[in-house]
């Protein structure tokens, strides 16, 4: 079971004929795959930013999660982003992020209001400096491998969602705490604003899961609404 590779699928009606078609989870990320390069001016508070760097930690995360991204942050406005890193929750500039990362891509929740963006920023401010969830990250490695069984092709989305949550209950436990790793922090920030991205436990979500919540992709777990692609701030 530990060696199985997963690729989530979904059966959707064809755009023109309405006939059922089988969609596969997409790993495409580069602007050459249909994206566009943007500047930080295009960002709005609450935008979700996914990144990848060339270091060993990033490569390891991408290999384990079978994803082109390894980190997640949230845009606060005023050229600042918030993120959970090893030193804890921190706020830094977009320029600093662009200097450190090889790939930076932004997504937006279509229903996020200005008031909810303020609530997200309030959540961030109240958690700045809090500790990183090292235990959650360590548990992600075996969980990421075990869950691939649930993500085999042709597994129905509801079954896949139930399967992943079941494995998470065993591998991760069901408790909650006030320490976060990067993608968990994003999920909790949105939940605090009354706009949860999913009903699943934020601790089972990795940056790749956030990527697959985008429009036109196949999410591994059930989501409330797809994220809209904003653009790439940097591409490898």
What are these regions (language model features)?
Residues 1-236:
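Cysteine-nucleophile amide-bond enzymes
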């Amino acid at each position: 079971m530990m060696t199985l590779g997963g690729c989530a699928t979904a059966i959707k009606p064809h755009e023109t004929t309405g006939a059922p078609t089988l969609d596969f989870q997409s790993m495409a990320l580069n602007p050459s795959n249909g994206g566009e390069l943007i500047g930080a001016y295009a960002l709005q508070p609450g935008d979700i930013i996914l990144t990848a760097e060339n270091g060993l930690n990033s490569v390891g995360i991408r290999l384990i999660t079978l994803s082109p991204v390894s980190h997640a942050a949230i845009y606060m406005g005023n050229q600042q982003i918030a993120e959970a890193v090893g030193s804890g929750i921190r706020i830094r500039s977009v320029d600093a992020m662009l200097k450190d990362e090889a790939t930076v891509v932004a997504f937006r929740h279509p229903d996020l209001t200005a008031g909810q963006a303020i609530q997200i920023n309030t959540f961030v401010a109240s958690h700045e400096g809090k500790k990183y969830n090292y235990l959650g990250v360590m548990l992600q490695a075996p969980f990421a491998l075990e869950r691939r069984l649930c993500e085999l092709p042709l597994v129905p989305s509801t079954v896949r969602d139930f399967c992943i949550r079941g494995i998470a209950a065993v591998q991760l436990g069901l408790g909650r705490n006030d320490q976060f790793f990067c993608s968990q922090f994003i999920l909790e920030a949105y939940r605090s604003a009354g706009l949860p991205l999913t009903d699943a436990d934020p601790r089972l979500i990795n940056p790749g899961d956030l990527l697959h919540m985008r429009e036109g992709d196949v999410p591994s777990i059930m989501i409330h609404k797809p994220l809209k692609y904003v653009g790439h701030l940097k591409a490898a």
